[in-house]
Swiss-Prot record:
Binding site residues for Mg(2+) 3: D274
Cofactor note text: Binds 3 Mg(2+) ions per subunit.
GO biological process: alcohol biosynthetic process; isoprenoid biosynthetic process; mycotoxin biosynthetic process
Name used for this protein in its record: Geranylgeranyl pyrophosphate synthase esdpD
UniProt enzyme class: transferase
Amino acid sequence: MIQLPPTPLHDLNPAFHQEFSSMSWSALHAMPSTTSVGPSLKEVNTFSQHKSHSIFHHGAEIEQQNKFRQEKVIISAPLDYLGSLPGKDIRGKLISAFNEWFKIPEEKLEVIKRVVGLLHVASLLYVHEIQHTHFEPSLTKPSKSLYRIDDIQDSSKLRRGLPVAHNIFGVAQTINSANYAYFRAQSELFTLGKPQALDIFTEELLRLHRGQGMDLYWRDSLICPTEEEYLEMVANKTGGLFRLAIKLIQLESENTMDCVPLVDLLGVIFQIRDDYQNLQSDQYAKNKGFGEDITEGKFSYPIIHSIRKDNGNSQLMNILRQKTEDEDVKRYTIQIIESTGSFEYTRQKLISLTAQARALLKSLGVDQSSGLASILEFLELKQ
C-alpha cells in the first residue's frame, strides 16, 4: 500500500483559515474574542465540525418548529372552527363577574378563562358531537345515515346556525381534537404555579364525566330518572366547568368567600333553562335544530316531569325510543309535554331557583348592579 506523506499545515487551503477571523470565532463562542495564537489544525477541524453541526442543528430546529406549527393547525382545526362560531361566552362573562369580588391578577384570570374555554369546546366536540352519535348494534361500521348529530352526542346538525364540526372534519379527527384540548387545558394549569390546581382540575373533570355518563346511560337504556337524580347529574355535569373556574379563582385570591353553592345553583339554572329552550324557543330551533332533545332521545327536565306526571307516559317513552327526526312527530311530542303542565312546571322551577340565587347574592353582600346580577337577569326566561 502506498503511504502518502502527511499534508503540511501551510499546504491546506488558505481560504479556509482566512474565512474565520477571531471575531467570527468569538461571535460563535468557539474561542475568546482575542488571542495571540493562531488555530491549530485540530482547532480548525473542531470548529468546522462545530459550525456544520450548529448550522444543521439550527436548520433542523426551525424545520421542526414549522412542522409543529403545521400539525397544531391541523389537530386544532375542529377546536378553532367551533371557537370561531358566534356565541354569548356566558362562561367567560361569569368568570369576569366573580373576579369583581376576588380581584386576582388579570394574567391569572386569562389562564383560567383559557382552561375553561378549552374544556367547554372539548365538551361540545366530544360530549355533544361524538357521544351523541348512534350506531345500529348489528353493524360494526356505521354508515353516514346512522350518525345522529347534535354535535355527535345530541343528534343535532347545527351549532349556532352552522354545521357541526364533525360534519366538516369527520368523527375521528373531531374526537382527537377534543382529547387534545383536554391536555392543552391541563398544560395551561402549570402557568398558575399551584400544585392544588391540578387536583381541582382532576376532581371536577371526574365529576363532569360521572354526570355525563349517567345522562348517556339513561338515554341509551331508556330509563327515566327521577327529578332528584336528574338535578344531581346536572350539578356534576353542567356545574363542573363553573365550579372548576371558581375554585381556581379562589385558589389565586386572598378572599376566602365560598361561592361554590352559588355556582352549583347557577349550573342547574343554566341546564334547566337550556332544556326548556330546546323545546320552546324559535331562536334555539334556528341555531341548533327543532326539538333536538326529542331526536336525541334525551330525558330533559320537562320530559322527565311529563313522564312522571302521566304514570310513565308510554307514548312519550315510545317516541323517545324512536329518536325521530320527523318534525310533525316532534310537534305532537311537544303537545304531550304541554298537556301534562310540564313547561309551566319548568318555568316555575326556574323562577324559584333564580330567587334562591338572588337571595344567595344578597347574603354574600353582592350589589344588584354587579356582573353576577346581570348574568342572572340574562338567564331569566323572557315571556
